[in-house]
Amino acid sequence: MEKLQDQYSFLCSENIRKTNPLILNILQKLDEEIEKRPKEKITVNIAGNSRLDSGQRITSEDFWLLSKALRNHPCIGGVDVRYNLIGDVGAYYAAKLLQKQPNITYLNLMFNDIGPEGGELIAKALQKNKTLKYLRMTGNKIENTGGMLFAAMLQMNSSLEKLDLGDCDLGLQSVIAFSTVLTQNKAIKGINLNRPILYGEQEESTVHIGHMSKQNHVLVELHMCKHGMKNYGIQQLCNALHSNSTLRYLDVSCNKITRDGMVFLADVLKSNSTLEVLDLSFNRIENAGAKYLSETLTSHNRSLKALSVVSNKIEGEGLVALSQSMNTNLVLSNIYIWGNKFDEDTCVAYSNLIESGRLKPENTDVEPYVVDEHIYLSEVSNGLKRHYYWTPTYGECYVPSSSAGFALVPVGERL
């Protein structure tokens, strides 16, 4: 098999184009990896936000030649070109790559200036694709038009397991379309529909996703950040969770849920035995909401493993109640509380949990320290999805403590 760097150099000279030193360097390293492990699948990683490469970004022309070099190589299992400038033209070549390269199971195109036209090309390519397991389109403004085409694609595609369309400017129509399609699709295990462009206060998107969750018995991971969800919306989701036995990771962060919504959530946690990760970050559940959760976690629930209540206007009383529930509930291993109002009792309670070994330092986002014989808590870089937007390209790339949600509930080929 011809080396990737040689193939790329030949294509550049054949098409009278200059070789990109960044691509050439990465392909050289990949060739070395392939020589060491010829039977393993390799991911081509050319992230445009890598601090090691001085912010160089590849263009659609670069991606055209790169994709041609990758087409016939059996060792290529994934392509990650996040934070580059491939645009709609590059999306055309990505679609061609999906048609020509049968070994790719992971494709990351997040934040690449791909619009509705590029989204259409990729969605149509996936209608016939039978190998891709995980696609990230995060941050590409495919809008409602592109969203509708991806929803239509899911009616035909039976191999894609995880789809991330967060920050894609989806409209209400496409969110409803996904909800409808997912009542029938038996392959999708994880979906991200974060930050759609919604108008009105009727929470229609949440109502439809709630109906879908009642009928879908495959979905494991659901992200619904920034849906403008209020207590009525969380009530609809909770009604669905009473009869859902597959969902393990629910992300409803950055919404408008208050203490009243926690009544419904605490109630469903009494009977639901599958939900393992719950992200309530950046809502407003306050002390009362935290107490509802702590009571359920103390007396009933023994399935939840990770809870994030970051920035929820919770004060000492509610935070201490949650810490006390961990003394009784030995299944709950991860808790994230930064951004709330810590008093001395809170600092002492979480310090005791950490020092006793009940709460491992890597499983929380706070760390105790002492000044003048008083205990305080500082923030540490742990969380459910700290590396959702940015993953380090130096040192240890995958740190479970920074992406604990995905570590506890792994879905898709690459995370």
Swiss-Prot record:
A Pfam family found in this protein is LRR_6
Q: Which InterPro entries match?
A: Leu-rich_rpt, LRR-containing_regulator, LRR_dom_sf
Principal cellular location given in the protein's record: nucleus
Is Cytoplasm there in the keyword field? yes
Q: Where in the cell is it found?
A: Nucleus; Nucleus, Nucleolus; Cytoplasm
Query: Which controlled-vocabulary keywords does the entry list?
Result: Cytoplasm, Differentiation, Leucine-rich repeat, Nucleus, Repeat
Q: Which GO terms describe its cellular component?
A: cytoplasm; nucleolus
Q: Which residues form a coiled coil?
A: none
LRR repeat positions: 246-272, 274-296
Any single biological process term in GO: cell differentiation
What's the stated role of this polypeptide? Highly expressed in stem cells where it may be involved in regulation of pluripotency. In embryonic stem cells (ESCs), important for normal expression of the pluripotency regulators POU5F1/OCT4 and KLF4. Also important for expression of the ectodermal marker gene NES and the endodermal marker gene GATA4. Promotes stem cell proliferation in vitro.
Subunit annotation? Interacts with NPM1 and NCL.
Note the PANTHER family from the entry: LEUCINE-RICH REPEAT-CONTAINING PROTEIN 34
Listed name of the protein: Leucine-rich repeat-containing protein 34
Which organism is this protein's natural source?
A: Rattus norvegicus (Rat)
